[in-house]
A protein has these predicted regions:
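Short, hydrophobic/amphipathic alpha-helical patches that form generic packing surfaces
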Residues: 53-64, 94-98
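Charged interaction scaffolds used for protein-protein
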Residues: 1-10, 15, 30, 34-46, ...
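Active-site-adjacent beta-strand anchor residues
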Residues: 18
Length: 121
C-alpha cells in the first residue's frame, strides 16, 4: 500500500488535504520563533499548544492543496469542527499529530521505537 503524501481533515462535507512542506515549516518557525517539533513536545507534562499556534500550523499545511485560504478561513473551519462535537484535543490527536508524522517531522511510534533501539546499541 502506498502512503498518501498528505493527511486529511474531514469537517462537515469537506475533506481538506494537509501537508507541511519545508517552505511552510520554515515560515512557521520564523513567525512562531520556535522549532515546529518543540510545539508538539510532550515531555513537558503534555502541555496543549495554544489554539492560535495549532491553527497557524493548520493554515501552513492546508494551503498546499487548498490555495487561497486565509487564516480567518481556517478559524471558521475550526469553528465548524467544534460545532460537530470535536474539541481542541481532538484537533491535536486526530489531525495535527498525524500531520506531523505524515509530513516527516515526528516519527510514527513504530519508527520511534526502532530509532531508540538503534541508539541504545
Amino acid at each position: 500500500m502506498t502512503k498518501k503524501p498528505y493527511t486529511t481533515w474531514q469537517v462537515g462535507k469537506e475533506e481538506y488535504k494537509l501537508k507541511l512542506t519545508t517552505s511552510a515549516v520554515c515560515k512557521l518557525e520564523e513567525n512562531l520563533g520556535v522549532n515546529i517539533v518543540k510545539i508538539f513536545n510532550f515531555n513537558d507534562d503534555f502541555p496543549l499548544p495554544p489554539l492560535k499556534t495549532m491553527l497557524y500550523v493548520l493554515h501552513g499545511a492546508i494551503t498546499k492543496y487548498q490555495h487561497g485560504l486565509k487564516f480567518d478561513d481556517v478559524m471558521n473551519i475550526f469553528d465548524e469542527y467544534l460545532d460537530e462535537g470535536h474539541d481542541q484535543m481532538d484537533l491535536l490527536m486526530e489531525v495535527l499529530i498525524p500531520l506531523m508524522q505524515d509530513s516527516g517531522f515526528i516519527p510514527k511510534e513504530e519508527k520511534k521505537a526502532e530509532k531508540v533501539k538503534v541508539l541504545k546499541q
